[in-house]
């Protein structure tokens, strides 16, 4: 797995922290054995409002109207007893992120849901005197709409989609000589759906519009199936096959060479070892950064 990780890092030419790239690489390799062009569903969640965080953004206002004492109970009493897991059960982490984020202004709330590291963590890791810039927050504030769903989708179409999904899809597919076609990102479709009222887009639930259209083409068992994320068992990897690599390569010397503050890194590694909070994505990002430095 370590060799495959290094190959993936070289394919990007820059530190890229989304571990789903690993799966896309394997899938592209298998697909290329049979075809040279494949269709992918990238853009479906951004265009048709499929992410769970969109639901969170829509109910945040209702949550904020709860009495302050009740929200404090949720944050101070309930959150500590929710055991997070990096082995595939993400709902405790998502509840914590929602409760913490809902106390922030909307732009900072949304940024906190899509970032690996909080501004405070980045400030400690980089040893900065002032908090770092938050591009997601800026995009959210400057979105040309006032409806929360519009703003979230527009923010993702300008950030999460091109800088994340399209980036790893292109890098990993082309690495294996596979060309991807993305019909859900046809500009005519994106523009048409974007002109619909938010209430129409989410009628029937997240991605409800796409599901209704698909009923004419697909069996009900596919149309009604709950959303399944395309995520690897990252926590298990980090505590099994990749554990020696973490131990040997994420060190005071390598992190100093990367410009990171070792006590801040050690704090993340300690959380990872204790297993109380799901910090697998943060550890993965640190490992990818180290491998990028070592292989380029």
Language-model region placement:
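Short, hydrophobic/amphipathic alpha-helical patches that form generic packing surfaces
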Residues: 155-163, 282-295
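Short amphipathic alpha-helical segments and their helix-coil junctions
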Residues: 133-148, 194, 258-276, 296
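N-terminus-centric sequence/structural signature that marks the extreme N-terminus
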Residues: 5-13, 35, 130-136, 248-259, ...
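PAPS-dependent sulfotransferase catalytic core
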Residues: 218-273
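Hydrophobic (often cysteine-bearing) scaffold residues that line and stabilize catalytic clefts
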Residues: 19-23, 149, 153, 157, ...
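N-terminal glutamine amidotransferase
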Residues: 24-28, 84, 101, 225, ...
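ATP-dependent adenylate-handling active sites, centered on carboxylate activation for C-N bond formation
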Residues: 1-133, 171-217, 273, 277, ...
């Amino acid at each position: 797995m370590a060799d495959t990780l290094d190959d993936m890092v070289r394919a990007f030419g820059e530190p890229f922290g989304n571990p789903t790239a690993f799966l896309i690489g394997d899938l592209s390799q298998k697909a290329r054995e049979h075809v040279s062009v494949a269709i992918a569903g990238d853009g479906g969640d951004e265009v048709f409002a499929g992410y769970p965080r969109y639901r969170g953004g829509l109910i945040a206002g209702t949550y904020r109207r709860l009495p302050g004492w009740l929200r404090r109970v949720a944050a101070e009493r309930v959150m500590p007893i929710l055991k997070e897991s990096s082995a595939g059960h993400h709902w405790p982490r998502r509840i914590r992120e929602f409760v913490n984020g809902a106390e922030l202004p909307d732009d900072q709330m949304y940024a906190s849901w899509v970032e690996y590291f909080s501004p405070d963590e980045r400030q400690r890791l980089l040893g900065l005197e002032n908090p770092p810039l938050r591009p997601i927050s800026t995009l959210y504030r400057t979105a040309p709409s006032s409806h929360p769903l519009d703003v979230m989708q527009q923010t993702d179409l300008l950030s999460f989609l091109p800088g994340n999904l399209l980036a790893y899809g292109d890098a990993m597919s082309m690495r294996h000589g596979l060309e991807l076609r993305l019909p859900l990102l046809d500009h005519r479709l994106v523009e048409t759906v974007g002109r619909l009222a938010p209430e129409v887009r989410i009628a029937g639930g997240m991605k409800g519009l796409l599901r209704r259209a698909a009923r004419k083409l697909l069996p009900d068992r596919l149309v009604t199936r709950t959303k399944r994320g395309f995520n690897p068992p990252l926590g298990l990897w980090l505590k099994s096959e990749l554990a020696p690599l973490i131990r040997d390569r994420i060190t005071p010397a390598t992190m100093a060479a990367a410009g990171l503050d070792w006590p801040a890194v050690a704090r993340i590694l300690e959380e990872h070892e204790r297993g109380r909070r799901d910090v697998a994505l943060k550890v993965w990002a640190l490992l990818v950064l180290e491998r990028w430095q070592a292989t380029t």
